[in-house]
Amino acid sequence: ITYLSPSLEKDTSPVWSKDNNRIAYIKTPNEKNILPFEERREGLPWSIHIANSSTGEAKEIWKANEGMGSVFRSVSAKNQIFWTADDHIIFPYEKEGYTHLYSIKTTGQDEKLLTPGSFEVQFVSMSQNDIDIYFSSNQNDIDRQHIWMTNSQMANPDQLTSGLGVEWSPTADKNGNLFVLASSYNLPAHPYKVNKNGTLNSLAPKAIPKSFPKNILRKPEQIVFESSNNIKIHNQLFLPTNYDEDKNYPALIYFHGGSRRQMLLGFHHRGYYHNAFAMNQFLADQGYIVLSVNYRSGIGYGMKFREALNYGANGASEYQDVVAAGNYLRSR
């Protein structure tokens, strides 16, 4: 057994070089007095190291800045860093206040933001040629997710899917064919092949029975209201069949758990919330107005929203969004 530069810090996400002689990994400092359900906007900066697999000798090649992005923020992926065929490391980083992808050379030079903008990356995978990176994000469609592609040489990512659906978990085969899981407001998730023009072909068309009531499911409205401290809160509003704005209806407010979650304008990528979306549709079918609230401390809207001041055990500031949701419904 060869230990890679052992220390008192936490070493995670190892990935081999293409020549199998080196290993890159993330090193996160140990910090005391870190409690759950409290905002953590900065900490001791994390870093990326590369070790010689024979000797175990390692070298730090990159380190996060102090302040914004100093606390490691993960993405949904098999591994948190990717070693590409052109000898770059691609990794998630919140330097700009959003979960983005960056690249550096394995020498530690030429840090580059691959996904610029006010949005967040979530599901990430690498192509089998070890060059291209596929990912889902809410760029230009903040309450949905679509699929994009980038690599260490691109200035801006290419958008591969769009529309009123939600796409995630991209994966490519050795021939470059791209596959995803996808849903919409009236179809639950199932697998698709992504065509070159961005359209989707179902790989399991019989997975959803003909009896599924897709024609009566409602397209939720995107609602944004302002809560305390001028924080914008995104919501999905489900209205009853044949809704009449001159009539009164019973109303329900849905709050997700977590709280690191973002409810979407379609069936969700997590099983529990996939079912919760269906439940909200059912309640609307029973004559209720349903408001699903993405309260502060959730994901999708940047680090400052996720690490909301005084949230959770440090003051429950997110409860102000509960009050604001009730006031919104009362004002309709």
Where are these regions (language model features)?
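A flexible loop/linker signature enriched in serine peptidases of the S9 family
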Residues: 1, 5-12, 26-53, 60-76, ...
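Residue-level recognition of a conserved intra-blade site in WD40 beta-propeller repeats
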Residues: 16, 82-84, 126, 172
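Hydrophobic beta-strand positions that form the internal "hydrophobic ladder"
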Residues: 20-23, 88-90, 132-133, 178-179
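Short loop/turn segments that connect beta-strands within beta-propeller blades
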Residues: 53-56, 105-109, 151-155, 195-198
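Sequence/structural signature of beta-propeller blade repeats across diverse families
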Residues: 65-69, 109-112, 155-158, 207-210
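Signature of short aromatic-glycine-proline-rich micro-motifs recurring in repeat-based ectodomains
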Residues: 74-87
